[in-house]
């Protein structure tokens, strides 16, 4: 931001104090803004090496910005503000410094804040625009993206919008969600940036970064409350705020516990099942593939516990990229698109991508967009069909797995959170059928494709019990006589001898990918170990 004019300083205020572990995670310090103020310069520091403090500002109306551990001087103004902070009127009256005790390395930490009140703007405004709901591409298909990307509007990140765009394009992504820490300062800026881009969709969002867990909100243009424990705020309140803003909420890196210290403060999810009915998603993988062997199985177990409890939570992925490096990063670092979240959506728009996640129509590629594509479809006795995320009612179901590009890998069918059956993928165009009888309480099925560790994970198809044949000791006959038993025998014969056609040829590709759950019949499942063409386009 370049200088515009020299401003006169109306007044300067210095505040200081001590922080201890007692008294909660946050300290709020009020201060008065004099009339005539157009811009505020904010500087803060503390005296204890190894300590991490977070800082934000609240105006009389509430949230004004959250720089977190950002140590640089901050400008908050009517015409322009520093990164992480909102631009707008400087209302005279009582404002507040918001201090978060992220990590205290001593029993007492001394902090100092200096505020300078100016009568004129000193920085050039950046282009801003209101959000415009855009459709960048019509039509349903699998769209590839990343729900967890930080821009320079996060206090601990450096990536410009241009760098994010260039890297996302290079990796073949269709969308990215800007999940900047506890702020929406990026929203108007990226709306202006989006106006000249037609091949990459930027989603509105933020990372709600608390000291007990992080989560991405997708679809909000207002700040989501993150001060858990302050003024009685609970995680349920935060989830309610996200829902009220029209956003979905995805739990980020839920098992990323790096122990004591400030390596990743509050990264692991510690809120248990509180408010889980308001959670739309959970990151199955975050950042570098190097983390999959360390945290992968723990996250899957947590996900299955949620599903066992009845929550239809969608598995997603997110890079947590902070720098947008165009070259592949060193081991352990993240890059946009690793992992890649592939969403079946009716079009490339924010609303359609969000709806795809709500419906569970998601496949996660843990290494990136070039990983194999895995799909799962289900067909019931009556011809009703389901794709990933759907529910089908059937007493017996045919599950068809299709893999593109995974020759030599192992494909595992998971049923209700347990490994059910595995097959070796024989070729780069592979299909396999599993036939299962539905349990009395229903079933859920997903696929995991692996080498040494998981490479691709699908979301679930849900199967509810259909009309069951009468209990006659296994003969299939009705105990009351009549034609009931014969009917079920004939139905079984029709089922076992139904015509099968190769549905995954290149000419039938579009038909394969359009969901018609309970609204018509898809092509019949392909025979075991047949070849064809399938992919995420």
What are these model-derived regions, one by one?
Residues 475-487:
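Juxtamembrane/start-of-transmembrane alpha-helix segments at the extracytoplasmic/lumenal side
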Residues 38-41, 87-108, 442-446:
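Noncatalytic modules at the cell exterior or secretory-pathway interfaces
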Residues 7-39, 124-144, 152-154, 166:
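Non-catalytic extracellular/lumenal accessory regions of secreted precursors
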Residues 120, 133-136, 310-314, 321-470:
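C-terminal functional module detector
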Residues 130-271, 277, 283-303, 318-328, ...:
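A metal-dependent hydrolase metal-coordination microenvironment
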């Amino acid at each position: 931001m370049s200088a515009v004019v020299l401003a006169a300083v109306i007044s300067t205020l210095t505040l200081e104090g001590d922080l201890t572990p007692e008294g909660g995670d946050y300290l709020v310090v009020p201060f008065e803004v004099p009339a005539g103020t157009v811009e505020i310069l904010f500087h803060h520091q503390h005296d204890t090496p190894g300590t991490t403090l977070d800082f934000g500002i609240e105006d009389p109306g509430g949230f004004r910005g959250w720089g977190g551990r950002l140590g640089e001087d901050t400008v908050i103004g009517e015409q322009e503000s520093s990164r992480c902070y909102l631009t707008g009127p400087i209302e005279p009256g009582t404002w507040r410094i918001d201090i978060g005790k992220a990590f205290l390395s001593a029993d007492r930490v001394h902090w100092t804040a200096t505020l300078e009140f100016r009568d004129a703007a000193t920085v050039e405004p950046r282009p801003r625009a209101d959000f415009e709901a855009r459709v960048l591409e019509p039509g349903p298909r699998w769209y590839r993206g990343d729900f967890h990307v930080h821009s320079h509007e996060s206090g601990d990140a450096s990536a410009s919008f241009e760098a994010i765009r260039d890297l996302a394009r290079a990796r073949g992504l269709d969308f990215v969600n800007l999940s900047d820490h506890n702020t929406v300062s990026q929203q108007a800026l990226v709306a202006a940036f989006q106006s000249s881009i037609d091949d990459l969709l930027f989603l509105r969002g933020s990372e709600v970064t608390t000291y007990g867990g992080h989560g991405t909100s997708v679809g909000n243009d207002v700040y989501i409350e993150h001060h858990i424990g302050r003024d009685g705020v609970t995680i349920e309140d935060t989830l309610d705020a996200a829902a009220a803003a029209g956003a979905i909420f995805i739990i980020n890196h839920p098992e990323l516990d790096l122990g004591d210290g400030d390596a990743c403060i509050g990264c692991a999810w510690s809120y248990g099942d509180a408010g889980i009915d308001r959670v739309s998603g959970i990151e199955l993988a975050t950042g570098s593939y190097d983390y999959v062997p360390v945290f992968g199985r723990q996250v899957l177990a947590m996900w299955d516990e949620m599903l066992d409890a009845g929550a239809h939570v969608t598995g997603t992925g997110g890079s947590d990229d902070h720098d947008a490096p165009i070259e592949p990063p060193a081991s352990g670092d993240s890059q946009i698109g690793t992992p890649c979240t592939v969403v079946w959506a009716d079009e490339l728009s924010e609303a359609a991508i969000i709806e795809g996640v709500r419906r569970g129509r998601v496949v996660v590629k843990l290494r990136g967009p070039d990983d194999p594509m895995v799909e799962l479809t289900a067909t019931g006795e009556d011809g009703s069909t389901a794709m990933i995320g759907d529910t089908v009612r059937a007493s017996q179901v045919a599950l068809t797995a299709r893999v593109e590009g995974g020759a030599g890998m192992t494909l595992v069918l998971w049923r209700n959170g347990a490994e059910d059956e595995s097959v070796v993928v024989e070729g780069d165009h592979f299909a396999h059928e599993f036939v299962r009888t539905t349990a009395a309480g229903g079933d859920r099925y997903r696929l995991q494709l692996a080498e040494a560790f998981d490479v691709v994970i699908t979301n679930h198809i849900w199967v509810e019990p259909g009309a069951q044949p009468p209990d006659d000791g296994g003969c299939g006959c009705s105990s009351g006589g009549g034609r009931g038993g014969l009917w079920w025998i004939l139905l079984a014969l029709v089922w076992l001898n139904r015509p099968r056609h190769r549905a995954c040829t290149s000419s039938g590709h579009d038909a394969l990918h359009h969901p018609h759950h309970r609204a018509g019949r898809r092509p019949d499942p392909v025979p075991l170990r047949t070849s064809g063409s399938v992919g995420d386009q």
